[in-house]
Amino acid sequence: MAAPWASLRLVAPMWNGRIRGIHRLGAAVAPEGNQKKKRTILQFLTNYFYDVEALRDYLLQREMYKVHEKNRSYTWLEKQHGPYGAGAFFILKQGGAVKFRDKEWIRPDKYGHFSQEFWNFCEVPVEAVDAGDCDINYEGLDNLLRLKELQSLSLQRCCHVDDWCLSRLYPLADSLQELSLAGCPRISERGLACLHHLQNLRRLDISDLPAVSNPGLTQILVEEMLPNCEVVGVDWAEGLKSGPEEQPRDTASPVPA
């Protein structure tokens, strides 16, 4: 009967050794599992942020495409209905309003619908355009520059209107008398300097232009540039109360401070 007990005594160390070996193996495997888990999380975060960036780029490109489509040229429509009809249609599609000479204002409703009656006025000059909050950009101005009798133009809060757009307004110099640029975030002093062609302007609104670094001084310069124009929207002393060392610096200027 001693033999079985002896066999057990011989087997026990071997079994215990295997258990210890398994534990040591588990301890060696554990870090690799943690590393794999970390790699999985890192890969997830990489893919996640890549997807977010790709989505952002896609939405940006989609928005740019929509703006481009809204500002396409209506030359084909001009051939059928003339420049007044094509220009009016462009503004109304953008959500703006137009006024033909001796007619009432035509505006779209809250759903973007507007009366087709304006097609009856295609031979009547457009004398006023309210394009406030519209998506007009540099290319879209082609549809307005053909309105040679345009007297009043409002571009308030047009986020795509910039200095380059103002440089294109000179074809309206003979007729344009009122211009509103209030709230346009991309218009600076450089763009306002391009308005020297518009010597028939009688009223110019340049209020709330965040890209203008010194509104008070800018208004003074614009008034000298357009002596027959009433420039409104800026306190002449704004930006002139602080000393020269406190003046905000134009970071886009190539001239060092």
Swiss-Prot record:
Keywords: Mitochondrion, Phosphoprotein. The modification Phosphoserine is found at residue 253. GO terms for cellular component: mitochondrion; SCF ubiquitin ligase complex. It comes from the Eukaryota. Gene3D superfamilies: Ribonuclease Inhibitor. One of its GO terms (biological process) is SCF-dependent proteasomal ubiquitin-dependent protein catabolic process. SUPFAM superfamilies: RNI-like. Interacts with incompletely assembled mitochondrial NADH:ubiquinone oxidoreductase complex (complex I). Required for the assembly of the mitochondrial NADH:ubiquinone oxidoreductase complex (complex I). Involved in the assembly of the distal region of complex I. This is Distal membrane-arm assembly complex protein 2. The lineage of its organism: Eukaryota, Metazoa, Chordata, Craniata, Vertebrata. The gene is DMAC2.
